[in-house]
Amino acid sequence: ATYKVKLVTPDGPVEFDCPDDVYILDRAEEEGHDLPYSCRAGSCSSCAGKVTAGTVDQSDGNYLDDDQMAEGFVLTCVAYPQSDVTIETHKEEELTG
C-alpha cells in the first residue's frame, strides 16, 4: 500500500506519497526534502518528529520509550507509514529538552 505523508516543517508543509515498506525519511529525501538526521538507525533523536494524525510502524527503532511513542514522537529514519499520516518535523529539542 502507498499512503499520503504530510510533513509540517519550519519552512511550511510538504506532502508526498510513501509506500508502506519505505522509511519516511528516505522517501522525503527522494522527493528532495531536507530533514534532520544523524544515525539513520533509530538510535538517536536527530530525526525526531511528532505524529499528529495517522499511524506509523517504527519497530526498527530503539531510542524512544513507550511513553514518548504514546505522546506521538516518531523517528522518521525508521518509520513506515501505516495510514495517511501527518508528522511535525524538527522535534528533537521538544523530545530531549
Curated annotation (Swiss-Prot):
Binds 1 [2Fe-2S] cluster. It is found in: Plastid, Chloroplast. The keyword Iron-sulfur applies. The keyword Phosphoprotein does not apply. Its cofactor is [2Fe-2S] cluster. InterPro entries: 2Fe-2S_ferredoxin-like_sf, 2Fe-2S_ferredoxin-type, 2Fe2S_fd_BS, Beta-grasp_dom_sf, Fd_pln. GO terms for biological process: electron transport chain; ferredoxin metabolic process. One of its GO terms (cellular component) is chloroplast stroma. Its main location: plastid. This is Ferredoxin. It comes from Datura inoxia.
